[in-house]
Amino acid sequence: ISPLLALADSVTGALEGGADIHVTAGELSGTAHASLDNVTIRKDETRIEGVSGRIDLARLMPPLTRGTQTLSARRIIAGTELLAPTLTYRIEASPDGPLPRLAIEAARVGIAGGSVSLLPTHIDANRDDHDIDLDLDGVDLKTLMDLIAVEGVSAEGQLSGRLPIHISRDKVFV
């Protein structure tokens, strides 16, 4: 499925898939699919628990998905606990170049007593800059400040609203 799984300390759960691969005149083509059911990946102190969903590639090179797909997990532990992350997406051809783009229709995660959602957007491998909008709902500021642990910074209350973010190759602007 991914060479990155070889870097994990452990992978458990049900994972099955298949591929139809063709090589013609040195060009790789074909399709592939994978189903994940309650897959947990561990690496050191980081865990992604309960990943479920189906990945269905209509084309391997460059990769394109067969329609919209959803992946979900029970939780992610990476310095903090992220609850019930979900991602609804497709990988599609880009109008900006030969590499595909990730079209995110919905993404959501529970954090700091609230939730953060990514509004629909495109992440294009052909572009250096991306603008995304996060929708924050009931995120506890004290918990959030404890997570990021910036010395001398504290806050109380809840954070809700839209947060625009601009990402360039080497900078992030909020």
Language-model region placement:
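Extended intrinsically disordered, low-complexity coil regions enriched in Ser, Thr, Gly, Ala
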Residues: 47-49
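Mature extracytoplasmic or organellar-lumen-exposed domains after removal of signal/transit peptides
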Residues: 168-172
